Amino acid sequence: MARLRPRQRKEPALGWAGLGGLLLLLLAIASGGALAYFYFSTPARPVLDAQTLCPVNGPQGITVVLVDTSDDLPETTQREILGQLDDMITTLPPFYRLDIRVLDIAGVRSRSLFSKCNPGDGEGLSEWTDNPRIARLRWIEDFRKPAALAMKSSIAAAKANSSPIMAAIQDIAIDQFSSAAGKDAKKTLYVISDMIEHTRNYSQYARAGDLSFQRYKQSPAYLKFRTDLHGATVIIRYVTRQVNGQPLLDGTKHVEFWKDWIEDNRGIFGGAKRLQGA
């Protein structure tokens, strides 16, 4: 009599539920991989100082704006200056420091009205790894608004009998361009002024002498205000002073003097542009 073979047990079929679970598992793995890719491939944002908003290891760039109001500025000129300053605020790269300064006549130096880094406005941040909305709010409240307020204050009239532009630039070079943190940073200085240096050590008014750099080198101001701009680019926004409709100084020779002065102090002359209305 033939022996009965035991019936083979069939493995349970995967079924739709099992297939769905497998797909969900694969989707989770893929999503996790994508998130990890974004997290590790996105450049890490630097740690910022709570007060200055600059990276704790120093700003990536430094932009200083020196506004000279030792003489009144025409309304048209003021409007153009405000427009240019607003452009600087809104286009400053992230993690660059913006320092807005005016002449400190009494102290024979400069005075800072605002000095902070752009912390970034949230543009380009990932929703996965950052919070663009909070970054935007911080940029507005901690950077944009106070910088705009300082910008308006910088053009307030402060008429004076002297104009220590060289001393102010020397002060800026010591404060902003000489530190180890600023050594490798891109450095730019904008000077908004008629550029007429007038102190007891040296004056550029016609009654004091010509605009030659040689005359300046023979004055006490040459050694007193000699400085190191550490390769900073200096850009002049030139205000033309007039008497009876005629320029007070020869603008071409005047700008040439300042080009020589900047280069003699280890800076880069970035050009001069005449402002409207003056």
Walk through the language-model features, giving the residues of each.
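Acidic, polar low-complexity linker/tail segments
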Residues: Q8-V64, S70-T77, T90
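VWA/integrin I-like adhesion module and closely mimicked acidic/polar interface patches used
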Residues: F38-S41, I196-D250
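Von Willebrand factor
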Residues: N57-D184, T188-L189
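Acidic/histidine-rich, surface-exposed loop or edge segments in extracytoplasmic proteins
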Residues: G58-D72, A148-S154, R237-Q242
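Hydrophobic beta-strand segments of well-ordered beta-sheets in folded domains
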Residues: P59-V65, F95-I100, K187-L189, R226-T240, ...
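DG-centered beta-turn motif at the end of beta-strands
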Residues: V67-T69, I172, K186-H198
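Extracytoplasmic/luminal low-complexity segments enriched in Pro/Gly and acidic/polar residues
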Residues: H230-A278
